[in-house]
Amino acid sequence: MPRKKLVGTVVSNKMDKTVVVRVERTFAHPLYKKTVKRAKKYHAHDEDNSCGIGDIVEIEECRPLSKTKKFKVVRIVKKSVFGEEKLETPENVEMLGGEEK
């Protein structure tokens, strides 16, 4: 039986070597035929801690790695700029010892 492959968005990377991936699926309602969206969260193994919040990743089913972790990150499809900080913002300059008088 082939392994499931899913594509989703990383919503949390606070755990060590683990990310939470939100996978959305759409389907037609059986009675009303309206397109409905449903989402499910999966814990996935990220060996290098390389995923950030907002990244779009591909995950693949694997052997159980823990009680809730049964997927691993295969590749990062698209990196997000959501989590990046720029050091030039006024708040960061003040925290770094900023302005000379």
Swiss-Prot record:
One GO process term, biological-process aspect: translation
GO molecular function list: rRNA binding; structural constituent of ribosome
Sequence intervals crossing the membrane: none
SUPFAM superfamilies in alphabetical order: Nucleic acid-binding proteins
Coiled-coil intervals: none
Tagged with keyword Nucleotidyltransferase: no
Pfam families (alphabetical): Ribosomal_S17
GO CC terms of this entry: cytosolic small ribosomal subunit
Keywords associated with the record: Ribonucleoprotein, Ribosomal protein, RNA-binding, rRNA-binding
PROSITE patterns from the UniProt entry: RIBOSOMAL_S17
Subunit structure, interactors included: Part of the 30S ribosomal subunit.
Function: One of the primary rRNA binding proteins, it binds specifically to the 5'-end of 16S ribosomal RNA.
Assigned protein family: Belongs to the universal ribosomal protein uS17 family.
The protein, known as: Small ribosomal subunit protein uS17
Species annotation: Kosmotoga olearia (strain ATCC BAA-1733 / DSM 21960 / TBF 19.5.1)
